């Protein structure tokens, strides 16, 4: 198939146009014509939208993928990445056997990658861990996981790390993208994840995008918004960003604001609502309470960093009891004039925006993604968004609500719901709550006190701890942090190459991370294994294994469970723990955690022709079903109810809580949510008093801003054709050809000032590192003067050499959207 860039973009535009016109691509006709191809369903491997894909296999290979016409999410459509899913597993450089750095027949950190057996790989890993545990606390061994990990894999990891090896140093790459959203949900509602669903799109009058380029990052949802905008009466779209991108093409109100000023804009909107008597007092009085946040909370940098001095970093997450009058006073400072001064947004646009939120007749949905979350005040800005929806009662009902969109296919279903964060357990439970720990130990049949109650090193702290020698073993799975993590020059790379440390990367390809590791483990991808994802609207979707992985590739699930056989309880648990459960003495962690009478009690069905399950063949039981049902027991009866495992293989996903076989579309609202009692109307039942929190916090400046030397803002992100670090998409010929290399987008005036022209080779320089790229002053992204935009998919241009590892001090999520940079001709 030959596809030039112009045809490629026209094709994608045609897909969006077809969606806007209500046309369904005739997938089933295509399917019927392909004789000899077996078709089955699976959720897409990429973003958090959760599109369902029909996967065509023949002769042991995936040969085609099509949008699933029976799926409610995407209705037969796929974005351009989804249409080429069949090719992601067949790059020429698949890693097909374990590779260890060796010299003279033994491990050497400076040696060359040498093929070894799985037994050799697991033996050296186990030896390293056991040696560390003899000298240090368990948090010195770590895992870096992913929002792309399946539900089963994530749950197995949590069990092995927190219960088996007794380390809370397990964190996902979702720390970099969804932590602020998750923490804000918990602080506001006492429960994680959105209350609404995608059905809001067809019921809303107004859509406001904050830091979200849905046209390229969630194109199928964007096609539904486009359809609603073009076919509905008086439907409006507002797009807000620090630069102009493709979503602006549909915007009725396009708004460009200065970095970090979204804080001031949201406080202005809250002030406008109050000053113009648009507060829904009935809702506010019944269903909310007020708190004030800690201020001057720092930037999540190393404690010795100058920006951390004199701050309230240690109490950053505190919320103090407050009332409406104090909240009113906090936001009253943010007048139209002040919001304009801080944000640079014209006053008429600010007022138009505020009126939309304040108008009780307008159904309004707010969408946001990384522009909001990757923010040194990401938790605050998320909570500010909830403030304006709570003040107006525009929440938890059809067509109204705040909606945090996830960027990965199971950032919700695995990272958040399963709990692969340093502080979490399944179903919103946390390791710092003794009751939650006791519940987990009961379900897992553990001695009391097995699960440690001190969180380990979070994602950014892992890099620092590796560099400092406090973390000595790291196993990275299903992610590429050496390319995707922040400040890799100063923090990440030194820790990975620290001779005290041993780094393992499970990866299907020789990614930037893999080639920096000590041991590479070949991993299965997507439908080479059985899996499950949870998307942004709480929809859980499962799929069956459809082909085998190449060579000696094994799923991450197989790797975790098989590796557990290399440890006996006597080697990793204290005598005090073993005395409580003497029957566990001498047993492997595999026997205690997985072959434990619960996880191993199911067998794979034999009545499905052609159905394969490599894990069941190896372990002798239906591992995925056993893990799922045990995991589901955490949430059933607690507002996180999942349907029985087998049900999910018969449907295109269900949105939890699923009670009595019925999914929940709008949480917390009577008539939709089975946990809201008759007469309550709305109950935010994650909090003991059923009330949501409205939080008063101010605008605070970013960690780093342009100055005389580093005179531009740097914002990083993605493009339509590629996903994250490009490990998969750059190996799809059509996608690589359409967008082969990273670019830097700059305003023509800024280019002229620097003697630069479109297409020039340029060098980007920050206080942390530099990178060579090419300049684009005419393309799809149009930046304002003073700001440049670039992406991170290109392994040949390591953008994260430039970025600052400042984080939100409450969520520890990284701010990739703003630091100071200078650009010169290369």
From Swiss-Prot:
Cofactor: [4Fe-4S] cluster; Mo-bis(molybdopterin guanine dinucleotide)
The keyword Iron is annotated on this UniProt entry: yes
Gene Ontology BP annotations: cellular respiration; Mo-molybdopterin cofactor biosynthetic process; nitrate assimilation
Enzyme class: oxidoreductase
Modification after translation (UniProt): Predicted to be exported by the Tat system. The position of the signal peptide cleavage has not been experimentally proven.
Domain of life per record: Bacteria
Residues noted as binding Mo-bis(molybdopterin guanine dinucleotide) in the record, renumbered to the chain: 81, 148, 173, 177, 210-217, 241-245, 260-262, 370, 374, 480, 506-507, 529, 556, 716-725, 800, 817
GO cellular component: membrane; nitrate reductase complex; periplasmic space
Binding site for substrate: 792
Compartment(s): Periplasm
Annotated GO MF terms: 4 iron, 4 sulfur cluster binding; electron transfer activity; iron ion binding; molybdenum ion binding; molybdopterin cofactor binding; nitrate reductase (cytochrome) activity
Residues of the 4Fe-4S Mo/W bis-MGD-type domain: 37-93
Pfam families per record: Molybdop_Fe4S4 (PF04879), Molybdopterin (PF00384), Molydop_binding (PF01568), TAT_signal (PF10518)
Binding site for [4Fe-4S] cluster: 44, 47, 51, 79
EC number: 1.9.6.1
Cofactor note: Binds 1 [4Fe-4S] cluster.
Subunit annotation: Component of the periplasmic nitrate reductase NapAB complex composed of NapA and NapB.
Main function: Catalytic subunit of the periplasmic nitrate reductase complex NapAB. Receives electrons from NapB and catalyzes the reduction of nitrate to nitrite.
Name recorded for this polypeptide: Periplasmic nitrate reductase
Organism (species): Actinobacillus succinogenes (strain ATCC 55618 / DSM 22257 / CCUG 43843 / 130Z)
Gene: napA
